Amino acid sequence: MYMRDMEESAVLLGMVRYFGNDIKRISHAFKVYGFARAILSGERLPEEKALITALTAILHDIGIKEAVRKHHSSDSRFQEMEGPAVARSIMEGCGIHPHVMDRVCFITGHHHTYSKIDGPDFQILVEADFLVNIHEGYITPEAAPSVVKKYFRTSTGKDLAASLYGWANAGKSAL
């Protein structure tokens, strides 16, 4: 097993332990992680950026539990506020390098603030999260093509969206 795989596995287990029996949150994290890995395979990021992307996919919504506890809301601004501290705590327990933790925490703390996207690691996380949110019904089928057109930048993410949601037959112009 490669070091990146071991780090990802440790953080996945940390996320599962943190969420406990909250299968909805755990399942969402695994789906976003899966799509992020798929996009990563097509985009070929350097190893450290790939690790950051994968860890962020696992931990992007980790602030929900604290947001609900402290603010009685899972609103995105509270997730962004509470997420980085929880993410850092999980990663510290897994021996993740501080530089990697800092970047994961930055993205986790801004993952619904699309104007803050500043690199391919952040971009891929956003695309993977949107792919899952479309499937889970948080974005309507009518709104999905415009979301993809506005926010997707990677060719792999665009191709996945077109294939998954039936836009492939309509051609790339639908996106």
Please report, for each region that a protein language model flagged, where it lies by residue.
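Active-site flanking loop/helix segments enriched in acidic
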Residues: E7-K31, G63-S73
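His-Asp-centered metal-binding catalytic motifs of divalent-metal-dependent phosphohydrolases/nucleases
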Residues: A50-H72, G83, C105-H112, D129
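Short helix-capping and hinge/turn segments at secondary-structure transitions, especially at repeat
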Residues: S41, I64-V68, R88-E92, I96, ...
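Membrane-helix interface segments
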Residues: E47-K49, V100
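Divalent metal-dependent phosphate-bond-processing catalytic cores, especially two-metal-ion Mg2+/Mn2+ enzymes
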Residues: Y2-M3, R17-P46, L59, I96, ...
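Amphipathic alpha-helix face/heptad-repeat signature
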Residues: R25-H28, Q79, V104
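An active-site-proximal "capping" alpha-helix that borders the catalytic cofactor pocket
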Residues: V32-F35, R77-G93
